[in-house]
Design a protein with these regions (language model features):
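Carbohydrate-binding surfaces of carbohydrate-active enzymes
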Residues: 2-328
């Protein structure tokens, strides 16, 4: 493959977030570590996705900002029969100009004028999400509660979308890579399947000064999905400073987040931050968050717990931890 290409479709109107454009664009840019082409994206789209005025322009520039060198719409005109009759193109069924057509034309006119300045935009990101197809397969076979085939992708999206909302740009890297030194922070979602040399490379990157964020279901089985027979997480136990040997689905379990993690942008937490030891003054704000889909029953070795489970039985187990390992 010389140039990566992709199709990116997503909700619109009041449900337009930019999350899908960023996540899918980052995957495409990272395939060749270079610019890519958006070969298909929605014009009018399906019935629920007809864009508000201005959204087509916002979406187009979002694609370019992620490193795309093109925005191509599916499709030119809306077709008149078969299954995609209501997957609307730039033109409707009457072939006449409409608001979507006029907005697309104005985008094209802009790019005819300034396109040379928008082509081949480059990024130098300091964070990367590591993706693994074997782990995707593993979590399809042994899914998280209620998520089924979407278990792995859902966890990856949680992390990617969190970075997006924090305005932290990131790359995607393959689990085939072993040198993570070009990134300050490596983010590893649900690495259910991993070879020992990959787990060692991740551990070494932290020891040498990198930062690692990882989730439950990481370091659990080898590349053939055979579960490792020692204490979990395999090889990463010392790096993370934790261990566990049991796990379950959370039922009526929640966690109480520290003030700085719960809603850091609300005025009540800003006031609390300036008054050591105080809690949020905004009565509508809550620090409680419900646990969903999976819980590892984690015991801290050298790690420091950030918070525990709110549950009469599981309260002794850490829900999230932080650890110093080597230089990282």
């Amino acid at each position: 493959m010389t140039v990566a290409g992709c199709d990116i479709y997503h909700p619109s109107q009041s449900l337009l977030t930019g999350e899908e454009i960023t996540f899918c664009g980052n995957i495409s840019r990272s395939l060749k570590k270079d610019n890519y082409l958006v070969l298909e994206t929605q014009a009018q789209g399906n019935i629920a996705w007809l864009p508000y005025p201005g959204q087509l322009r916002l979406q187009a520039y979002s694609h370019i900002a992620n490193g795309s060198n093109s925005v191509m719409y599916w499709h030119w005109h809306s077709i008149h029969n078969a299954i995609e009759s209501y997957w609307k193109g730039v033109l409707s069924h009457d072939f006449s100009e409409n608001e979507t057509y006029r907005e697309a034309a104005s985008i094209g006119a802009d790019w005819k004028r300034i396109g040379t300045h928008l082509k081949n935009l480059q990024k130098k990101n300091r964070a990367a999400i590591l993706l693994d197809n074997n782990s995707l397969t593993g979590l399809r076979l042994f899914p998280l509660k209620d998520l089924g085939n979407y278990s792995y992708n859902t966890v990856a999206r949680w992390l990617g979308d969190a970075l997006y909302h924090l305005n932290i740009e990131y790359d995607m890297i393959s689990s085939a890579e072993r040198d993570f030194s070009s990134y300050e922070c490596l983010i590893v979602p649900a690495l259910y399947s991993a070879s020992e040399d990959l787990l060692t490379a991740i551990s070494d990157s932290v020891k040498n000064g990198g930062h690692l964020i990882t989730t439950f279901r990481s370091g659990f089985s080898d590349e053939q999905l055979k579960i490792y027979a020692d204490t979990q997480p395999h090889i990463l136990q010392e790096c993370l400073g934790i261990h566990y040997d049991q796990y379950t689905y959370p039922v009526d379990v929640s966690v109480t987040l520290p003030d700085f993690m719960a809603h850091p942008s609300c005025s009540g937490h800003e006031n609390a931050a300036s008054d050591a030891g105080s809690s949020c003054s905004d009565e509508s704000c809550t620090n409680s968050s419900k646990c969903l889909h999976w819980m590892d029953l984690v015991t801290c070795d050298t790690a420091t717990p950030l918070f525990f489970y709110d549950h009469p039985v599981w309260k002794k187990y850490a829900a999230a931890t932080v650890n110093q390992f080597g230089k990282g």
